[in-house]
């Protein structure tokens, strides 16, 4: 798709502050202006308890992170060919669907697929409560 169309994903474009703030919970501090460059949020687990209203405690903006460079510059796709694609926005997915003549699944379709077709159970493995090996 990218090679065929020249499409540039949202993570490969500099973000717009107003668009970011509109997506965050009220009271969330704005990102540092120096971070408003092409990149994406990369999960960084906290090592201590953190306030839940500030996503910067567990997500870090990484310059240059994109579907081609999952953790930023220096990271690559080699060895991840069977992993889900990351750093793809809804806009990116819609552009791909339009190009491919397809559509995104509905919420119900996505949930059915995510559960592997399993219906009427509390968890994807059945009704048994989660254990350390099933979380």
Predicted feature locations:
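Short capping motifs at secondary-structure boundaries
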Residues: 1-10, 100-101
């Amino acid at each position: 798709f990218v090679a065929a169309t020249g499409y540039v994903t949202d993570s490969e474009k500099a973000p717009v502050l107003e668009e970011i703030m509109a997506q965050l919970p009220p009271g969330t501090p704005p990102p540092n202006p120096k971070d408003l460059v092409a990149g994406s949020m990369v999960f960084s687990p906290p090592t201590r308890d953190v306030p839940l209203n500030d996503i910067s405690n567990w997500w870090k903006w990484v310059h240059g992170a994109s579907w081609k460079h999952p953790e930023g510059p220096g990271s690559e796709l080699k060895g991840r060919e069977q992993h889900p694609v990351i750093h793809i926005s809804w806009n990116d997915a819609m552009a791909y669907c339009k190009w491919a003549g397809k559509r995104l699944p509905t919420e119900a379709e996505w949930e059915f697929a995510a559960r592997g077709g399993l219906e009427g159970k509390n968890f994807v493995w059945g009704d048994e409560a989660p254990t350390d090996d099933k979380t």
